[in-house]
Amino acid sequence: MPELPEVETVRRGLEKLILGKKISNIDIRYPKMIKTDLYEFQKEIHGQVIQSRGRRGKYLLFYLDDKVLISHLRMEGKYFYYPDQVPERKHAHVLIHFEDGGTLVYEDVRKFGTLELLAPELLDSYFISKKLGPEPTEKDFDLGSFKLALKKSKKPIKSHLLDQTLVAGLGNIYVDEVLWRAKVHPSRTSNSLTAQEARKVHDETINVLGQAVEKGGSTIRTYTNAFGEDGTMQEFHQVYDKAGQACSRCETIIEKIQLGGRGTHFCPKCQRRK
């Protein structure tokens, strides 16, 4: 699943490709992806100009003249832009055509992605209803609030970080990387972390996601950016998908367990359960 770094990389790419373009029509081949009333969606999006691009957590935002198009890529969603002729693609489910002849294509092998149209003034309440936590930046991700939320929860720290309420944008890959850097076992309950450990998890969340954005995200299976290019953050992973290999910090063999239904990688020496 694309996590914050991958979604941010897609956002940056699309910003270079489609900003200022006017939508002439939209071809929806898999209507279940559209979470707004289908008729209203097609009616409202016609003639809109893409004014700017944004992101909130793992959500891509297309700011139009008087609406916001919200896109969630889920497991396998991808965007491709074609300046003229669009090749026939098996998994192309939504095609946004522009007046200049270009087309933005949304492809999704799993068909789990979603699109919905919203008035800009409803955007804040939309994300509040999703219980979406703050962005993982020094400005938005408050350490005090994070520590307080941890103290109130008996959830395993990995599961808690994944549920998006503590901080937005983390997924399975980067949670494993954050907890390895912070030397915290993924199955420990949130309220068992010391103040020092909580600070370390907080800081490494910002560091890991920031580095991953710089590297264009991680290409593990099929992820590519808007230009069809792979990310390179996978070259800097320390534990994810490295079960059976030596820990780069202590040379203990990395282990993989199931935690909350998710494959979880950790070093049993560096990340003791305590």
What are these regions (language model features)?
Residues M1-L115:
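Surface-exposed binding/hinge segments that line
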